[in-house]
UniProtKB/Swiss-Prot annotation:
Cross-referenced CDD domains: SIS_PGI_1 (cd05015), SIS_PGI_2 (cd05016)
Classification via SUPFAM superfamilies: SIS domain
Predominant location: cytoplasm
Name of the protein in its database record: Glucose-6-phosphate isomerase
Pathway participation: Carbohydrate biosynthesis; gluconeogenesis; Carbohydrate degradation; glycolysis; D-glyceraldehyde 3-phosphate and glycerone phosphate from D-glucose: step 2/4
UniProtKB keywords: Cytoplasm, Gluconeogenesis, Glycolysis, Isomerase
Pfam families: PGI
Amino acid sequence: MKNINPSQTAAWKALQQHFEQMKDVTISSLFAKDDQRFNQFSATFDDQMLVDFSKNRITRETMEKLQALAKETDLAGAIKAMFSGEKINRTEDRAVLHIALRNRSNTPIVVDGKDVMPEVNAVLAKMKQFCDRVIGGEWKGYTGKAITDVVNIGIGGSDLGPYMVTEALRPYKNHLNMHFVSNVDGTHIAETLKPLNPETTLFLVASKTFTTQETMTNAHSARDWFLSTASDEKHVAKHFAALSTNAKAVGEFGIDTNNMFEFWDWVGGRYSLWSAIGLSIALSVGFENFEQLLSGAHAMDKHFAETPAEKNLPILLALIGIWYNNFFGAETEAILPYDQYMHRFPAYFQQGNMESNGKYVGRDGKPVDYQTGPIIWGEPGTNGQHAFYQLIHQGTKLVPCDFIAPAISHNPLSDHHAKLLSNFFAQTEALAFGKSLAEVEAEFAATGKTPEQVAHVAPFKVFEGNRPTNSILLREITPFSLGALIALYEHKIFTQGVILNIYSFDQWGVELGKQLANRILPELAGDEKVTSHDSSTNALINRFKSWR
């Protein structure tokens, strides 16, 4: 990938000038001027997804200038580089090929002169065989009973993705009960294990190196819990599998290396649900549905790689995000799924975006002079409406929002879904168009009150509007459409990282805290007073020691 500071490009300077013309333009005025605005600023994908970005503070000229920025920063070249297996993760000297994991066309993808697809397909075949045995009851625990519960032990990408997807696809789940343990806080593993039966529980230990502190601490506690009933260590092999590449450590733990599922250095943690890390997904919904998830993502990969930028959904959403983050000064983006099954989707892309693009050093190794990744947050609707929407509607912060909803519910109870979707449609309309003082006074007048009687309260009921949103309407949340939606956001993040001249696929920011924790851990062992840190850290450690 090229090293181009976006703020020094002609396109960026043109956008700065354009912003001066646009900063006071309202969304309502843009709709008033153009009754075809929706048609111009919306697009569909595979008759499964409608993306409406018309309720944004953009014009055709805005998008043309943003597209010019993408062109000047060589986005097209970067997309080709990723899809062709170039080592675009330069700080770790790795290719970035989560797209290979879901390459349903099976066309060769070459890294270091070697086609990776045969290995990818071999692991998928091994996963299918394993899933068929466990789901079908052929796999037995040490007392001859079939598996009823699966516990995935991982953290970060080895937890967030599988947990999010298994929750989103609960309507497709089989009889197996899925559990996820990530936090090194002993409460997490203890509470998870309380209702489980060691005779019918299978553990998946997800750690590429088999050395991740949190994961291995939990794995050893799970092993101890299991052996407190099973006693004989030879039984571990019937109740533990590994998602790892460290065969030696896996074997020493007691896991049969035939039940070790590998993945590769070119699979980043937060993009790993498509790999063997997704084994918990396949066990939960069946391997055929896991393949549909891969197929949906592959369809979006093709869209991203082949569709012109002007109609390319990940690129369009990425450019709009840069517009708000760097020109309007918006520091956050909210992801608001109007589907309870999707309740972990915002948290998943909180990691996906913030760990990818939360960087202050450009690809040239120098601090940047512009904004990079935004803060990502969100909760399911309508819960959020009764929590934080107040600030989005009437606060002083600009919070661009993505609203996501399915047209068809998996649980068509009474009129629940109609009420849910009425809120979905109403919120974006309210955020865009607001309510003027005149409208507020007219509403009061309709109840028989005079302007004098309501003067003290009317200003507080005014909604300025002009709050930007994207609406993503899915036909239904299926494995295929969910795969496409996840890939849409993945490629949006990649696009922004390319344009903002940062490396999106490393995460050096997680290292310092881990290093210091490893230094502090032995200091917590005794009762001696600690003096090796700053006064604040020393005081906190010493108070902890006195209270424990």
